[in-house]
């Protein structure tokens, strides 16, 4: 199957993005322009320190234009910038975002946006207050609307290369169903928050009337039953954000009793099932999907196996629907927890060319 030439109209789309124009194209067409992505993880979504000092509190250096340029120039044309807002807002009912914080977020957004990247900003690590159950939903809904109204107003003049993702892994933290699809109550609360995000952003007008907005499922799950039980709002410019560390035994699990260190095509069935599920439930209904988080941890430098896995992952994402995939990079490669890092932010070089080159080569 011949892959589309996504570079064909590159100069035109870059000019339009920088002009601040939102083109008269469908959400499927916009997402179809994207190749592959990278997450600026554990930076603007870090917590535990006052004010803007939180950005470096989890061990990553302050984000620079040089970093983002290096990632974009490598071939990652989608830059997802996870942002935690909850620790940078005032009290109810206004929940005013700190001026210094939203200015810093905008500065980092501009690093990628000015390069011509597709930039995704979201609301990340908000689980302590964003609790999707009936006891908390009214207050959560109010705070969600207040935050997104301010963010949408701040960025309303940006072109269609800026994308808003309303919720990251919305779930009841610590509950038995946290990572197993939630409850009926929890899924209905997530539906409500998706709709509140959508309505709030659209009401700010300007380019936000047609901006691509990403909904999600409970915990951003790719489980078939969760996807089928998640409402799809009526809107011509939405897509879905899904997280898929598949298969978990290879990508994430560190339990030596049943984890996978090595990869071959005998495991491809799980990837085919994942992408087929997304195609049938979203793409076949003209709803685009972006896998906004995927990746495989470094297990004793198994880079060759990770390269084989990511080659298969991206191949099936492309062949079964043209789904852009955004690697979760938390900056950690050889020390610390969850070793998803592929880019060294201290030196602006790549920890592993083996994995990185496999991503870029298969996403063409």
Curated annotation (Swiss-Prot):
GO MF terms, alphabetically ordered: beta-glucosidase activity; cellulase activity; endo-1,4-beta-xylanase activity
GO biological process assignments: cellulose catabolic process; xylan catabolic process
UniProt keyword annotations, A-Z: Carbohydrate metabolism, Cellulose degradation, Cytoplasm, Glycosidase, Hydrolase, Polysaccharide degradation, Xylan degradation
Subcellular location as annotated: Cytoplasm
Positions annotated as active site in the UniProt record: 169 (proton donor), 293 (nucleophile)
Cross-referenced Pfam families: Cellulase
CC terms in the record's Gene Ontology section: cell surface; cytoplasm; extracellular region
Claim: Cytoplasm is one of the keywords in the record: yes
Superkingdom of this protein's organism: Bacteria
Catalyzed reactions: Endohydrolysis of (1->4)-beta-D-glucosidic linkages in cellulose, lichenin and cereal beta-D-glucans; Endohydrolysis of (1->4)-beta-D-xylosidic linkages in xylans
Main location: cytoplasm
E.C. number(s) listed in UniProt: 3.2.1.4, 3.2.1.8
Biological function: Hydrolyzes both carboxymethylcellulose and xylan. Probably has a role in hydrolyzing oligosaccharides derived from cellulose, which are transported across the cell wall.
Family affiliation: Belongs to the glycosyl hydrolase 5 (cellulase A) family.
Name of the protein described by the UniProt record: Endoglucanase A
Protein's organism: Ruminococcus albus
Gene that encodes the chain: celA
């Amino acid at each position: 199957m011949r892959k589309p030439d996504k570079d064909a109209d590159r100069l035109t789309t870059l000019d339009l993005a920088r002009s601040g124009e939102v083109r008269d194209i469908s959400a499927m067409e916009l997402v179809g322009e994207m190749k592959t992505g990278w997450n600026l993880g554990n930076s603007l979504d870090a917590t535990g320190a006052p004010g803007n000092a939180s950005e470096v509190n989890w061990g990553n250096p302050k984000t620079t234009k040089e970093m983002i340029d290096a990632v974009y120039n490598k071939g990652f044309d989608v830059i997802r910038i996870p942002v935690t807002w909850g620790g940078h807002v005032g009290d109810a009912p206004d929940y005013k975002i700190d001026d210094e914080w939203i200015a810093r977020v905008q500065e980092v957004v501009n690093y990628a946006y000015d390069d011509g990247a597709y930039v995704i900003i979201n609301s990340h690590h908000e689980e302590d207050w964003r609790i999707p159950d009936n006891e908390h939903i009214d207050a959560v809904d109010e705070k969600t609307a207040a935050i997104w109204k301010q963010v949408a107003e701040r960025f309303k003049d940006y072109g269609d290369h800026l994308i808003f993702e309303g919720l990251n892994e919305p779930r009841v933290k610590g509950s038995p169903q946290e990572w197993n699809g939630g409850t009926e109550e929890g899924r209905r609360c997530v539906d409500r928050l998706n709709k509140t995000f959508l309505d709030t952003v659209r009401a700010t007008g300007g380019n936000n009337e047609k901006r691509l907005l990403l909904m999600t499922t409970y915990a951003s799950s790719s489980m078939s039953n969760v996807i089928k039980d998640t409402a799809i709002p009526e809107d011509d410019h939405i897509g879905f954000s899904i997280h898929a560390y598949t298969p978990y035994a290879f990508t994430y699990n560190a339990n030596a009793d049943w984890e996978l260190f090595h990869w071959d095509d005998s495991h491809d069935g799980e990837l085919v099932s994942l992408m087929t599920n997304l195609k049938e439930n979203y793409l076949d209904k003209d709803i685009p999907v972006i896998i906004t988080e995927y990746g495989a941890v470094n297990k004793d430098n198994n880079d060759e196996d990770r390269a084989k896995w990511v080659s298969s992952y991206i191949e099936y994402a492309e062949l079964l629907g043209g789904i852009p995939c955004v690697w979760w990079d938390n900056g950690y490669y050889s020390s610390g927890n969850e070793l998803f890092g592929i880019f060294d932010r201290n030196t602006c070089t790549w920890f592993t060319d083996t994995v990185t080159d496999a991503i870029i080569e298969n996403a063409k």
